[in-house]
Structure formats: C-alpha cells, structure tokens
Amino acid sequence: DLYTASVVGSVRMCIRDRILMSNSYGVDNAIAKVPDRFKKDIGLEYDRLKWRNRRGRLESSLQILYDNSNRSEEELVRADLWWKQRESIVRSLIYKKRYKTAYKVASEHSLSSGPEFAEAEWLAGWIAHSFLKSQEYAINHFLNFYDNVSYPISVARGAYWLGKSYQETGNTKKAEEYFKAGSKFLTTYYGQLSFKEINYGGEFTLKEDCLLYTSDA
C-alpha cells in the first residue's frame, strides 16, 4: 500500500544517504539496523552494490549479484544501471583471469533489449570465444548482439565475431557468410577486418563521401 511504499522509500533514502557519506564501516552498521522486511529492497541492494564496487570489494559485490541473479528485468527496476555495475565487475574479473566467473556475471544480466542488452551479449560472447573457447555459447551471444543492433559499426562488429566463432568450429561456409556481411561496411574497423578475412592481401578503396558511423553498442 501507499504507507508501506512511503516507509520503504524513507528507509531507503536514509540508508542511501549513509552509503553516500560513508567511506568505511558505517554502511554495514546502517544496513544491519534496517528491518528485515526492507533489507531486500532492490534499490538498497543496488546502492550497496555500487558502494562496494566503487571501493573494489569484488567478492562482496559478487555476493550481491548472486543474491539477485534470479530477479527479472522488471524486478530489477533499472536493469540498465545494474548492468553498468556488472560490466565493471566483469572487467575486473577478466583482469584477474577469472574467466568462468566473468562469463557467469556477464551472461546473467536479465536484460531483454536496448543498447545495454547488446553490450552485455557481446561481452559474454567475447569471453566465451576468447577465454573459454566455447564457440557454441559465443555464437549464441553474438547472434543476440547481431540481431539487436542497427548501426553499421555494430552490425560489422557482430558479423566479424560470428565469422571468427564459426571459423573456430570449422564451419567455413557460415564464417564466410558473416565475413561477407561485415565487409559491406568498409568504413568501420570490423568491416575492414571482415574484408581481410575473405580477401587476404587484397586492397580496398573508400569513397570520398563515405559517412562516419556512430554505434548503438
């Protein structure tokens, strides 16, 4: 009801203020005093995650992500903001060579559309392709990326990595199909890489009036 919502909002704001002001143990003490029925408020969970991640508390940040891994996109309320924290944590895990954990965190994003969804799917695919050597998983993620972008720079990027993943599986036909798709966008970095994959040693020229593209992921 409205009263409960008001109380939850007030409690959250108090804890959030404490989180923003505190640099050490004040946050944990403040959280401990929150009534049990409010402790799993998704807004508080996000603020705690952001605070821990900002201070490099990797393991406790992971615990919050694991505790909320079954939440839907709707339940997370701002799944796009949760993804920004996830992405930061994923890159820390890659730096530490914890690739399986990085993949788990990247792939459990709960997103279903939008630029953050595309970013998450590409990153999960890249980890699967480059570090886990699991091309089946990589292809699934890269397809999700490829099917959800529209700007040439992003389409070329998706096509190139699909080509590389199919190449690793030995499926040269599918690899060439995607390299050809990527090579249509020669004004992009991945378009040029795609061209080189199917025209080894070949040269290409760009029109003087070619456009500069932005990215949707």
Describe each model-derived feature in a short phrase.
Residues 55, 96, 131-132, 169:
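Structural motif corresponding to the intra-repeat A-B loop/turn of tetratricopeptide repeats
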Residues 16-17, 49, 90, 125-126, ...:
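Conserved small-residue packing positions in alpha-helical repeats and bundles
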